[in-house]
Every structure is written in C-alpha cells, then in structure tokens.
Amino acid sequence: MDEVIVELKERSYPIYFDYEGFDRVGDLIKKHVRSSKTFVITDSNVYPLYFEKIEESLRKSGFDVLYEVIPAGETSKTMEMAQRLLEVAYDSGLLRDSSIIALGGGVVGDIAGFVAATYMRGIDFIQIPTTLLAQVDSSVGGKVAVNLKKGKNIVGAFYQPKMVYIDTSVLGTLNKREVLGGLAEVIKYGVIWDFDLFTYIEENLGDILRLKKEDLTYIVKRSCEIKAKVVSLDEKEENLRAILNFGHTIGHAIEALTGYERYIHGEAVAIGMAYEARLAFNLGYIDEGYLERILNLIKRAGLPADYEGIEKTDMLNAIKLDKKMREGRINFVLPVGLGKVDIVSVKEEDVLKVLK
C-alpha cells in the first residue's frame, strides 16, 4: 500500500492508495478516529456497489455503523440536505468523538465534510472517494461546502479529513462520462504544476481511457502528490492554493447557469480551462502552439471545449458573482508557460472578448 502525507503540522494526514478492495479500510480508519461510532454518508449510485463491503470491514474492526443514502448528483448539495443529515446524526446519538465517513464522489465528500465540520463544532471526518474526480481532487485538501441556488460552494469551510483512502479498482464501475470528468482535473494539474504529467497524458491517453491499471495508478497518485504539496504550502487559499482554480472561474459560472444539470463538474472545468487558455492567449501570456496543445488534449480526451446556449452577458454576470471577484476586476488563474500559471486580474471587456 502506497501513502502520501498532506503536511499540516499537527493536523497532517495520510492518503492511502490501495488496489485490493476494501478489506483493510476498517483497520486503517480505526487508527485515525477516537471512537467506534461512525456515520457513513453515501449516495444512491455508490450504495449498491460498495456499502456492504465497507460496512463489513468496519464492523470487523469493531465499529458501530450508521448510514444514510442521499440522491446522487449535484442537486443534493444543499443546505436543506445538510440539515437533514445533521438531524439524522443527532437523532442517532452521534457524539463529539464520533466520526463521519464520506463514501462517494465529490458531492458526497463535500456535503459529508460540511456536516462533519459543523456538527458539534466539528467531528472526525474520513474520505473514501469512489470517482476519479474525487480521488484526484475534491477528497484532498479540506474544502467542504454546499451550494446556493445562485452559486456553487458559497457556504462552506476548510475542514481537513483524518485520512483519505483511495482504491483505484473502483474506477472500473464508473461510466465513461464520470471518468472523463475526473480526467479534466488531472489535465489541470499538468497545466498548473507538472508539464511532464501533461505530456504523459498526451502520450498515454488511450491506455488511460481504457482504465489500464498502471496508468490510472500513476495519474491518481501524481495528482494527489501535487495537490498535497499545494495544500501543505497554502491550506486556506491565501495565495498559492488559488492556482487549483484553473478552469473553475468560468466552469462554476457554467454550472450555475445550467442548473448543475447540463454538465457534470469535470465537463464544466474542461470548458473553463479551454476558455481561460484562450483568454491567456488573447492577453499574450501563452503562444498559439501551447494553446492548441491544451485545446487538443481536452478534445482528444472526449471532453467539451465550448458551451452552448448561454448569453455573453449572463456568463459575465455569473463570473462576477464568483468568489474570485475583486474591486471591479476578475481574478483568473491563467497559463503563463509550460506547467506554469499565475493569478491575473482581468478587465471585464477582455473577458467579454473571449466569451461566445
């Protein structure tokens, strides 16, 4: 079993990489929590696939297991759902030394983490991500949140898990769309930090899309190493961590304007990366050759690079509602070189020029 540590001094925690199913997960979790009472939050897609295996491992390790199944999808990530889960936790007798386990993708991790962060001012939290996107991105770093109708992740906190358990064998049960959505975040890491990873994806895309074990294992672990490094250097997104938002400024606007239903998160991020790369080219930060490599990789991966049916002014207004707006200008993470990005304050008129 491989391991990567997110270094946060006394709050450091491990990311475990396992490839043999969930037999060991109960014993691993036992090392990192304070009591045997745990509340597993999962969704309607993941529950029939993995809950019994997780429950069996937890019970063998002496855990008293409660669980709740929420509807799959972004529309479950609401204050109303969080309140329901908080009430279930209270009615079930969860105490301050109890724990919450997120078993699922990014939505489950976000809302379960939000519940863990707020219940009794914070109880132990464990991440078991089951989608590629959650494994490479949302399960690591402690961002937890719910959406409001007008914006994504508006209500949330920084709340680090006690551990993350990643088993890449579960990715074989994902539909192709979910795999591609996760791959968008991996491409992001190549653009913002590690151009060797970008090149690796270009050269091994076929094997990655066929879910070849060696290639999946490499891109998942490398992505986690990059995110762990960034989070260790800037936990609360005061400066460096903002680079992880490449593609997300426009991506979040697209999600909000389409009601979180037309595009899954990774698809919206892919479109966001494409437009933010075009913006970087228009402003002179990258040359046409690099722009084309970014756009071509997004398209070769089967991801969208354009949005449909959204007016320019609506898009601009949604971008301005995002958390990245400062003093009349919009902060974008833009590529400025191979595997390098910078935070750039952009005028509204320059944003309008690049939008459809």
UniProtKB/Swiss-Prot annotation:
GO BP of this protein: amino acid biosynthetic process; aromatic amino acid family biosynthetic process; chorismate biosynthetic process
Q: Specify the pathway.
A: Metabolic intermediate biosynthesis; chorismate biosynthesis; chorismate from D-erythrose 4-phosphate and phosphoenolpyruvate: step 2/7
Q: Which residues bind NAD(+)?
A: 106-110, 130-131, 143, 152
Entry's cofactor comment:
Binds 1 divalent metal cation per subunit. Can use either Co(2+) or Zn(2+).
Where is this protein localized, as stated in its record?
Cytoplasm
EC top class, as a word: lyase
Q: What does this protein do?
A: Catalyzes the conversion of 3-deoxy-D-arabino-heptulosonate 7-phosphate (DAHP) to dehydroquinate (DHQ).
Name used for this protein in its record: 3-dehydroquinate synthase
UniProt organism field = Caldanaerobacter subterraneus subsp. tengcongensis (strain DSM 15242 / JCM 11007 / NBRC 100824 / MB4)
